[in-house]
Amino acid sequence: MKVKLALFWIALMFLYIYNDILSLYQPGHVAELTEGHSQGMYFTQPILFGAAVLMALPGLMVLLSATLKVRSNRWANIIAGIFHILVLIGTQFIGEGDTWLYWRFYELLELILLLQIIRLAWRWPQHRILMMSK
């Protein structure tokens, strides 16, 4: 189960990265980025720090999923998964302009992976949690 959860976090990181890479091909996007903003949102130090924390979490969850004891592992995955879903919902209200189809496709895949992470962690066999936490 630990390896499976770690693999889901790795897949999620790839989706985040490729989604951002594809956005560079949108007309005018690179110009906005070099001017310090995107879709009406200006890049301040707090915004970029928040983005760094947000993007560091899946990488840390790969490590934590592989190394934490079962009980801690289970809750770390549930909490991190819910947090990322809330962020995904929150991003629907940020920015200006139309969202491109590829972006929505990646968001759907991200949501599916996050729900699967939560489901796997939630359904972690209870007898194994009791046995492995001793």
Q: What residues fall within each predicted segment?
A:
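Transmembrane helix-loop junctions in multipass membrane proteins, especially transporters and channels
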Residues: L24, G28-A31, V70, F93-W100, ...
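Hydrophobic transmembrane helix segments
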Residues: L12-P46, V53
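Membrane-water interface at the C-terminal end of transmembrane alpha helices
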Residues: I112-K134
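Membrane-interface loop-to-helix entry segments
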Residues: A52, F105-I112
